[in-house]
Each structure stands twice: as C-alpha cells, then as structure tokens.
Amino acid sequence: MWRVCARRAQNAAPRAGFGARWTAFREEPGAPCVTPQAGSALARCSSKTPGYGRVRALCGWSPVSRATPRNRVLLQLWGSPSRRWYSLPPHQKVPLPSLSPTMQAGTIARWEKKEGEKINEGELIAEVETDKATVGFESVEECYMAKILVAEGTRDVPVGAIICITVDKPEDVEAFKNYTLDSSAAPAPPAAPAPTPAAPAPSPTPSAQAPGSSYPTHMQVLLPALSPTMTMGTVQRWEKKVGEKLNEGDLLAEIETDKATIGFEVQEEGYLAKILIPEGTRDVPLGTPLCIIVEKEADIPAFADYRPAEVTDLKPPAPPPIPSPAAPVPPAPQPVAPPPSAPRPAAPAGPKGRVFVSPLAKKLAAEKGIDLTQVKGTGPDGRIIKKDIDSFVPTKAAPTPAAAVPPPSPGVAPVPTGVFTDIPISNIRRVIAQRLMQSKQTIPHYYLSIDVNMGEVLLVRKELNKMLEGKSKISVNDFIIKASALACLKVPEANSSWMDTVIRQNHVVDISVAVSTPAGLITPIVFNAHIKGLETIANDVVSLATKAREGKLQPHEFQGGTFTISNLGMFGIKNFSAIINPPQACILAIGASEDRLVPADNEKGFDVASMMSVTLSCDHRVVDGAVGAQWLAEFRKYLEKPITMLL
C-alpha cells in the first residue's frame, strides 16, 4: 500500500490537499461571503478582508498549473451572490485531493480517524483508492475530526468534493453533530430547515454504507485494475475461505481480466471476514467491493450478514437448468403415458375424453395455440387453470399423440439436447475477438513466403542437446526465435510499430510467442531475445508457456513485444498466414518441416533436405514489400548457417 503526504499531493495538484491552509475552505463565524463582480472583489481585498489569504493564493494560479479555473474556484470559495452568515465555529472543509496525475475521482476505502478524535500532524486520516493504487492521506497540521461527510466505501467521489470537516478546538466538535454539507451550502438559509423532514429520504444511501461505521474496524477490498485496459473482471476462484488468516503476499483470489487470469495478492495481514462476490461472477466493475478483511479474528462473526449496496446488482452466472419448465415436466417413470405428467395420467380427461378446463385457461390456450391434451391440470379434480397454461412449455415432438412418447428423455424442453451448446464468452476471448477484428480492418496486410533448409539447425540442435543432457532441451522453435531477433537487428524496419503520427523503430527485440491456452490465444514475451543465448531462450519459453496454460502470467509478461512468432508446425500445418498483433508491424507464421528432394552436387544430382515453409505477414504502412523480403533473406541465412548467429 502506498502512502502519500498531503503536502506532496498539494505540490502535484494545487487544487487539493488536506491540511493545506489555503486549500481547506475555512469559514469564520459571522463572515459574509460575497461574490466578486467582474474581478472587483479582488481589487478591494485587503489583508483584513475575510478570506483574503485564500484569494491571494488564487492570484498565483495560472492555466499552466493545470489547476481548477480561477472563476470556478472563486465561486466555490465565495458561494452564491447572496450574503449569508455562519453560526458555526471556525472550521475547515477538507476536499478530496488529487493523489495521482490522472486522478479525477476516488473511493474512500477506509477512515482511520473517527469523529471527535484528535489528528496530529503526519497522522493517517483516511485511505483513498485512486486510479492507480490505494493511498494513505495524511494530515499536515493538528486538528480534530468534527464530521465525516463521505462514508466508507463511497465510490467515484470527484476530486475537490468535501469529504470531512475539521476544527481547531475539541469543544467545537459537538456543533457539527447534525451538520450536512447541503444545508450549509444552501443559498437561502430559511428554506433549509423546511425540507429537513425530508432528510430521512437520503438515509437509504447512508444505510447501505452504514456498515462502514456501525461494524468493527475493517477494510473493503475493492477490485483493482490488473491491466491497463481492464474495465471489469471475473472472480474465477477464491483461494481463501471466510475465517482464514491472511498473511502479506498470500494469494487471495484469481481474477480473469481482459488479458489473462491473474492472482490477486493480499497487501497486509488480517482475517477474511466476508466474501461479497461469489466465484464465477462475471463482469464485476472496477472498484466493486470483493471482500471484507478485519484485523482481529474475534470481529469475523459481526460480518455474517454484511452486504454493501454496491454488490446488490451483481449476481453469479445463472445455472443452466431452466427453473419454470422443471416443475411441470417431472421425469416420467412410466413411458406408456403420453403426457409428461405421469403421476396422474387420467386426470385431465373425463369419462368421454372430455378435458376439464376453466374458461379463462381455455381462452388463453386458444390464443397461444396450446393443445390442452398435453397440459397437466393442477386445479380441483385435475382441472386445467390459468397457471397451468402460463407455465406450460410445449415439447418439440407434439404434432401427433404418437410423437409425444419420445419427450420423456430429459426434462429440458426449450433446448433439445444434442443440437447445440451455448458457451459463455470469457473476457479474454472477447478481447481477442476485438483485437483481431481491429487488426484485419485497420492494418493493410500482405504476405511473403519462403522455404528454409533446416538441415544444419537440426544437426547443431542435436549436438547442443547432448551437451545439455540432464538440463533443459533446445527446440527448433528456440532457433527460430533467435534467428528472428537477429534478423530484426539487421532489418529494423520490421521491428517497428505504427503509432498513427509516427513510426516507432524499436532498438531492442522482444519476441512475442503465440501460445494456445484453454482460455484463448495469448502471447507471452521473450524480452531482449537478441542478446540471449539459446539455452536462456529455451528456459524462458518453457516457463512462459507453463504460466500461460495455468493462467498465471503477470501483465508485464504478455503486454508489449515488438515482433511475434506463431508456430503451428507441430500440428502438421505446412503453411498459413497469421494476423498481425497491433501495434507491431510483422508476425511470422511457422509451418512444419518435411523432407523434400533438392538439387545437389553429387553423383545422384539430388539430395533429401528437411525444408520448412514460413510466411511473414507485414503491415504495408510500415514495411514495404522489398523490406519484408530482405528480412526473410536474413532470417533464412541465420537458420541455414546457424554458426552466423555467433557473429
């Protein structure tokens, strides 16, 4: 967890900072707030004018500081055009500071001080979750917490919003017991007491957040951004159970992001008191409370019924069985009975084949085209009533009475088994689909193919693996990665990226290796492949591929890369064309090696060689055709004469 002093936050963003005397809105008793007219108020300000210090601080602001516009802040400080007097003791309105350069809103993760407590200089006031991390918010002056205006767990609090009130004297705390920000900021004071009976109306909102104040000291663990493009995630699995002790660094849960499944670690010690999001819950927005952690094991039972408002709309994935048809279609042990209702086969029909049905049910059946002989009645004496029509699900094999015999197989009427299966789209699969579509629609692909004689590589590989016996083995793919990296150094245009306004030519070669996983395709990266040896590359590839298949890759291990390799040769594919991984400019598709007859200077005039076909997909905006051909020539040279990789 990061901790930042408000003084540093103040320097980074002049518009906010707790304890900064010119940024906390200090209101003196009896001091009128007058809106300056066309800047005239600034001209009339003197050192004796109430709020002069605040105005003087504002005078030093400029648009370059990226602070809040001057007229907007003046309006916040001075209030409405009408005069108003405050009967409250001197106090400071503490705004939410900007704790990161890109922060626009924050979440109050936890209040470290309670109302009435003394706050010493340097003490932690609250923990605020920004767009980057959870940051400790410290005081830079001594004061007392008079009123907390934003409850724990409140999300998307705008930067600059008033979050609490502090006073200089402990005897002034009581005056703010019933203080609300709306009542103090209202333009017309007499109108404020009138709607006070309506104050219970907003009470449901605090009641949803009330757990933060009425429960023992605890911390809400919110869903963080585990990748730069992540907007929501899926809770794949909880690694800890309620009541278990958590140590710093322990794996708490596995979260499926838009890139991969990533382990979510605990940042501090405690006990897991409540799991708020069950396993399998999909599309959980960032910042949603996932669980509750307490410091003391004795506090765990207090959170048995804890349920914040943020998670009420989140539901785990619905089970595949359809609830309504399951009741009227029980499994029939007697296949002789035509209708699915085996318990009372003769109930719907009378002595002469008459069907007992209520007038309303008969009308509804006619409108819906339902054959009443197939409906089981649940009314008196087996009479069909409206409820039976509403809950009836016709079977597919119901055109004739004879065809009604097959349905007793399973109780799933709407979707016959064996026709198709709907597989939910994971976040990873959705992102893969979006990026592939974007690549094909926006990148002008062209393709170059070449055959490579792999005879020398196979001989060198055999010798090296003998030397490494008992250690890791070098594969043909490792030679391909090394040759690709060296070819990128020779032809740097292929190791470039299209950045809309510029073409970025990379000076290091990070090879992305396509790996197929149960969740979808992912491309872990062999960093600095151009300076690594074959053994190091082999170890990296094995480690990354294992992590990818187990869903344990960290974001930095698969985000980035300057050149991609996709190898389908192990499946017997001779050649194929791969889709470029933006913003990269090239991807190399590797086919299988096969023995071919090639011309040779010997008595027979030919020889048998192991030939491999490769296809280079290029972005024509970055790599021209001749440049792509030059890269393939360098690549083939390194593989057909692997000793040149040492140069």
From Swiss-Prot:
Cofactor: (R)-lipoate
N6-acetyllysine PTM positions: K466
BP GO terms, sorted: glucose metabolic process; pyruvate catabolic process; tricarboxylic acid cycle
Residue positions binding CoA: R461, S475, S566, N567, G591
CDD domains documented for this protein: lipoyl_domain
GO CC annotation: mitochondrial matrix; pyruvate dehydrogenase complex
Domain Peripheral subunit-binding (PSBD) stretches: 356-393
Record key words, sorted: Acetylation, Acyltransferase, Carbohydrate metabolism, Glucose metabolism, Lipoyl, Mitochondrion, Phosphoprotein, Repeat, Transferase, Transit peptide, Tricarboxylic acid cycle
Record-linked Pfam families: 2-oxoacid_dh, Biotin_lipoyl, E3_binding
Domain of life according to the entry: Eukaryota
SUPFAM superfamilies listed in its UniProt record: CoA-dependent acyltransferases (SSF52777), Peripheral subunit-binding domain of 2-oxo acid dehydrogenase complex (SSF47005), Single hybrid motif (SSF51230)
Principal subcellular localization: mitochondrion
Role noted for this protein: As part of the pyruvate dehydrogenase complex, catalyzes the transfers of an acetyl group to a lipoic acid moiety. The pyruvate dehydrogenase complex, catalyzes the overall conversion of pyruvate to acetyl-CoA and CO(2), and thereby links cytoplasmic glycolysis and the mitochondrial tricarboxylic acid (TCA) cycle.
Protein name in the entry: Dihydrolipoyllysine-residue acetyltransferase component of pyruvate dehydrogenase complex
Originating species: Bos taurus (Bovine)
